[in-house]
């Protein structure tokens, strides 16, 4: 190499160093040009997909991403901080949403048929599990189905009047609550059965409309 340099067929070592630096700069410029070309293609694709939205807010979103970019580890740490600050509140909210989705899924599985839903619940879960899972909701639902025959009998006897007034047990509740006071009030102000029957004979329209309720 030294002989070739002396004969002038090869450049000196200093010239070789300069050539190497130029080659490195050329490669670096080529890499940067490739990245710019890729960025331009990505920007063109985003602008084509989202239209004027990215043209108007793209720079703002990019700047915000640069300022507040969070790594995946930081996201996990943020979740841990929330769990420490709020305790079981977030877990309770998640569990309630999951229970609601499970209940909706089971109701859809029965196609909206209450009888099939009750059959499914009776054969799949114990009362303790039902109470733990749904609380008082299913107890009220089952109670309403158990009293279906009784309610049908009351409606058949008293018609639409009971829907406006209520069930006849309200008078018994008052008697239990106020004791002998209501008994004296009944004897003093309310008509007896004989008076009620005579009143029904005098007013057949009332008897036809309200049945035996008016005799009470």
Curated annotation (Swiss-Prot):
> What keywords were assigned to this record?
Cleavage on pair of basic residues, Disulfide bond, Endorphin, Neuropeptide, Opioid peptide, Secreted
Q: Which residues form the propeptide in this entry? A: 64-85, 93-131, 144-155, 165-175, 183-207
InterPro entries, per database record: Opioid_neupept (IPR006024), Proenkphlin_A (IPR000703)
Known post-translational modifications? The N-terminal domain contains 6 conserved cysteines thought to be involved in disulfide bonding and/or processing.
Q: One GO BP annotation here?
A: sensory perception
Function statement: Enkephalin neuropeptides compete with and mimic the effects of opiate drugs. They play a role in a number of physiologic functions, including pain perception and responses to stress.
Name the gene behind this protein.
penk-b
Secreted as a keyword of this entry, yes or no, is yes
Q: Where in the cell does this protein reside?
A: Secreted
Q: Does the record's keyword annotation contain Transit peptide?
A: no
GO MF term list = opioid peptide activity; opioid receptor binding
Q: Which domain of life is it from?
A: Eukaryota
State the organism of origin. Answer: Xenopus laevis
The UniProt similarity line reads: Belongs to the opioid neuropeptide precursor family.
For region Disordered, the annotated ranges are: 114-133
Please give an example of a GO cellular component term from this record. Answer: plasma membrane
Q: What name does this protein carry?
A: Proenkephalin-A-B
């Amino acid at each position: 190499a030294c002989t070739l340099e002396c004969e002038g067929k090869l450049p000196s070592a200093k010239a070789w160093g300069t050539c190497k630096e130029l080659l490195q700069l050329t490669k670096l410029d080529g890499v940067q040009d490739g990245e710019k070309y890729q960025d331009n293609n990505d920007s063109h694709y985003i602008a084509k997909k989202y239209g004027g939205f990215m043209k108007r807010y793209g720079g703002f979103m990019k700047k915000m991403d640069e300022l507040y970019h969070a790594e995946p580890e930081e996201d996990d740490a943020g979740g841990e901080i929330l769990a420490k600050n709020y305790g079981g509140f977030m877990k309770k909210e998640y569990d309630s949403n999951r229970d609601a989705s499970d209940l909706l899924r089971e109701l859809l599985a029965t196609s909206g048929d209450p009888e099939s839903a009750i059959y499914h619940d009776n054969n799949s879960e114990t009362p303790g599990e039902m109470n733990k899972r749904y609380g008082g909701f299913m107890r009220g639902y089952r109670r309403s189905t158990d009293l279906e025959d009784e309610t049908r009998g009351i409606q058949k006897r008293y018609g639409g009047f009971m829907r406006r007034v209520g069930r006849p047990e309200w008078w018994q509740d008052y008697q239990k609550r106020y004791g002998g006071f209501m008994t004296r009030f009944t004897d003093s102000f309310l008509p007896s059965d004989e008076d009620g029957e005579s009143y029904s004979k005098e007013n057949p329209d009332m008897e036809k409309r309200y049945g035996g309720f008016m005799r009470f």
